[in-house]
Amino acid sequence: MNYGYAEEQQKSLPSLQPEDEPFRYPIQLYAHVVGGTELRHKDVIEVGCGRGGGGSFLIRYFSPRSFTGIDLSPQAIEWCRRRMSLQNARWLQGSADALPVPNCCADVVVNVESSHCYPSVPQFLAEVRRVLRPGGRFLFCDMRTANRVSELDRHL
């Protein structure tokens, strides 16, 4: 679960299935992060997937070729494996600073509101670079206090 997103003008709201309406604001954050990035027929990794709600949205609305959700919590991954039977999805337990996937295996890496909890953001970003294919995209949002934004910018 994330804090969600609401545009002031509400001009580009995603059209949602009725069963997704209760989760509109968290879904809107994912839609905002994805922006105009094409995910169809791409290999997508989400680091910090939690219980899979964001991944479910990405799979059902953007049709990636494959989706890999990675989370540190074995309980969250077990939840995803039991509850999220989505086509072309897999759920892996692992740390953001040592992603359990091979080099150059992803077209897109997504990270929503979890990097502030990681012990080493520079190591996480090194892992993102390692797993992205040439020309790949890193789609990222998180929160930082104002005095820590420039530190994050240096690492990006």
Where are these regions (language model features)?
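A short acidic, Gly/Pro-enriched loop at the edge of an enzyme's catalytic core
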Residues: 97-109
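N-terminal, positively charged/glycine-rich alpha-helical extensions of SAM-dependent methyltransferases
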Residues: 1-13
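Class I SAM-dependent methyltransferase SAM/SAH-binding core
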Residues: 45-98
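A short SAM/SAH-binding and catalytic strip from SAM-dependent methyltransferases
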Residues: 108-119
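Conserved beta-strand signature within the Rossmann-like core of class I S-adenosyl-L-methionine
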Residues: 135-142
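A short glycine-rich, Lys/Arg-flanked "PGG" loop and its adjoining helix->strand segment in the class I
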Residues: 122-134
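Conserved Class I S-adenosyl-L-methionine
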Residues: 150-156
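Conserved alpha-helix/loop element of class I SAM-dependent methyltransferases that forms part
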Residues: 23-40
